[in-house]
């Protein structure tokens, strides 16, 4: 078996993470032997690690997801510290989503999009079709009422979607994915947060050099000073890291 179709797992504070070496490893793993895996993809960064610690419902949601991967550089560094031989790299959720969409377009995999503002969702659909000829079999913006959820799940099931991406922020998107899987289990689900906004140019992502240096968090802070409280909260994670409480 090709080594890229399997991946080791690592545990941080009780949370089991998949250790992908790079983006190609992630894609080969998810499309092992030409078959797209089924389950839920969840990106893990330091902020989400803190939320998991503090919120039992979120912890249960995240633990239930099959594919938890290191989206944040802090998490990658913690894995490498705890497991010095680990060959694990950051796989940014926004980049993984684009690669999945490109692969879906190439193979004709049916995709259902959930979340985002109506105009952003429409632009996302148009760009995906134009750029990669993605077979989008349905979509729903993020502005639906609780009583409309079941009808949405039935639509997703009827569409035959094999990839469902949900852009509603955490933990809303994890709740939606969990509940939708009860109706439509035969798909790969991915929570993508604000990815549609970035993809369509409504939100500017950090330049590549900032990402490479692991300073995307600093770029966002400089761009949005209001994030300072969120960033200060991460000092708790740094304490875990530097005291080895992982």
Swiss-Prot record:
EC number(s) per entry: 2.4.1.180
Gene Ontology terms for molecular function: hexosyltransferase activity; lipopolysaccharide N-acetylmannosaminouronosyltransferase activity
Pathway: Bacterial outer membrane biogenesis; enterobacterial common antigen biosynthesis
InterPro entries associated with the record: UDP-ManNAcA_Trfase_WecG, WecG_TagA_CpsF
GO biological process assignments: enterobacterial common antigen biosynthetic process
Alphabetical list of Pfam families matching this protein: Glyco_tran_WecG (PF03808)
Keyword Nucleotide-binding among UniProt keywords: no
Keywords of the record: Glycosyltransferase, Transferase
Class of this enzyme: transferase
Catalyses which reaction(s): UDP-N-acetyl-alpha-D-mannosaminouronate + N-acetyl-alpha-D-glucosaminyl-di-trans,octa-cis-undecaprenyl diphosphate = beta-D-ManNAcA-(1->4)-alpha-D-GlcNAc-di-trans,octa-cis-undecaprenyl diphosphate + UDP + H(+)
Function: Catalyzes the synthesis of Und-PP-GlcNAc-ManNAcA (Lipid II), the second lipid-linked intermediate involved in enterobacterial common antigen (ECA) synthesis.
Family to which the UniProt record says this protein belongs: Belongs to the glycosyltransferase 26 family.
Name this protein carries in UniProt: UDP-N-acetyl-D-mannosaminuronic acid transferase
Protein species of origin: Escherichia coli (strain K12)
Lineage: Bacteria, Pseudomonadati, Pseudomonadota, Gammaproteobacteria, Enterobacterales
Gene from which this protein is expressed: wecG
């Amino acid at each position: 078996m090709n080594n890229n179709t399997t991946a080791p797992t690592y545990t941080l504070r009780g949370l089991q993470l998949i250790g992908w070496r790079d983006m190609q490893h992630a894609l080969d793993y998810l499309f092992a032997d030409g078959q797209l895996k089924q389950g839920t993809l969840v990106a893990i960064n330091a902020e989400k690690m803190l939320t998991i610690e503090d919120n039992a419902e979120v912890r249960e949601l995240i633990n239930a997801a099959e594919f938890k991967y290191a989206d944040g550089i802090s998490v990658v560094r913690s894995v490498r510290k705890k497991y010095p031989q680990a060959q694990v790299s950051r796989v940014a959720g926004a980049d993984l989503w684009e690669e999945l969409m490109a692969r879906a377009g190439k193979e004709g995999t049916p995709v259902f999009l959930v979340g985002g503002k109506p105009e952003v969702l429409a632009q996302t659909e148009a760009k995906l079709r134009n750029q990669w000829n993605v077979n989008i079999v349905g979509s729903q913006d993020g502005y639906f009422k609780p009583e409309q959820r079941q009808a949405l799940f039935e639509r997703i099931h009827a569409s035959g979607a094999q990839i469902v991406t949900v852009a509603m922020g955490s933990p809303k998107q994890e709740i939606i994915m969990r509940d939708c899987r009860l109706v439509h289990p035969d798909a790969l689900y991915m929570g993508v947060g604000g990815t549609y906004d970035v993809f369509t140019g409504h939100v500017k992502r950090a330049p590549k050099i900032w990402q490479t240096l692991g300073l995307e968090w600093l770029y966002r802070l400089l761009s949005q000073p209001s994030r300072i409280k969120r960033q200060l909260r991460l000092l708790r994670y740094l304490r875990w890291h530097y005291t080895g409480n992982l």
